[in-house]
């Protein structure tokens, strides 16, 4: 397993569409994990110790996001099963949270957030991937749940643009698509990673023996 918490298997119900909710496994894994814990996307590289960022926080994420209508539409956009209702205590004005890296300390709040997200996914009728449903379940609901419970969400970087000029993280995000189809870009990117590993972690002397770094 890849989780330090000892999670060996995740069962995502068939009623949760993998086309729509491709990252649902993260939320089902988070349900099993005990807090405090950090959840990190597989396309995020953490280069520095983050202890000083999360110390004294209850919830800490990379950054908040703007409510862009094409990514974060209103409630009328969502195709939900009969009987599902959005909590009237959720504010649709809360800035969503980028969860490529997320720290949470409170077990009770974690369960409230995850249960709300899972309930949304399991009651969604949508079958075609459109980004909006997944980021609502994972990123916007986190902000809504925190707002309802009076929880403060801290950020590593106040604005999304701030992540460009820092050296704590490398987040591939959409760049994965370029690397997938462009061999030369993959070679250049791997070389940069290997050089940084050699420079900042000289004890990792076997890095150049890996095929990907040759």
Segments from the language model and where they lie:
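Conserved catalytic core of nucleotide-sugar-dependent glycosyltransferases
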Residues: 54-122
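C-terminal catalytic/acceptor-binding lobe
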Residues: 159-214
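Catalytic core and acceptor-binding pocket of nucleotide-sugar-dependent glycosyltransferases
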Residues: 92-181
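Short, polar loop motifs at secondary-structure junctions
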Residues: 1, 42-48, 158-160
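Active-site glycine-rich loop that binds ribose-phosphate moieties when present
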Residues: 21-23, 42-46, 77-87
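GT-A fold catalytic core of metal-dependent nucleotide-sugar glycosyltransferases
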Residues: 25-70
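Structural alpha-beta junctions
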Residues: 2-8, 147-155, 199-204
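Active-site-proximal specificity loops/subdomain of glycosyltransferases
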Residues: 1-32
């Amino acid at each position: 397993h890849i989780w330090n918490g000892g999670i060996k298997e995740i069962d995502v119900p068939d009623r949760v569409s993998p086309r729509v909710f491709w990252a649902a496994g993260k939320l089902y894994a988070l349900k099993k994990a005990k807090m405090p814990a950090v959840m990190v996307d597989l396309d995020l590289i953490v280069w520095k110790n983050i202890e000083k960022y999360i110390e004294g926080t209850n919830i800490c994420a990379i950054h908040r996001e703007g409510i862009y209508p094409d990514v974060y539409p209103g409630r009328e956009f969502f195709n939900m099963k009969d009987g599902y209702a959005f909590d009237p205590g959720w504010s649709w004005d809360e800035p969503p949270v980028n969860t490529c890296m997320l720290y949470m300390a409170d077990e009770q709040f974690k369960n409230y957030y995850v249960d709300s997200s899972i309930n949304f996914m399991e009651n969604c009728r949508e079958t075609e991937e459109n980004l909006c449903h997944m980021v609502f379940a994972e990123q916007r609901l986190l902000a809504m749940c925190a707002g309802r419970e009076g929880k403060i969400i801290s950020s590593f970087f106040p604005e999304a643009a701030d992540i460009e000029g820092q050296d704590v993280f490398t987040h591939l995000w959409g760049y994965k698509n370029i690397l997938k189809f462009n061999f030369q870009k993959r070679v250049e990117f791997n070389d940069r990673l290997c050089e940084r590993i050699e420079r900042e972690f000289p004890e990792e002397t076997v890095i150049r023996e890996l095929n990907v770094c040759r």
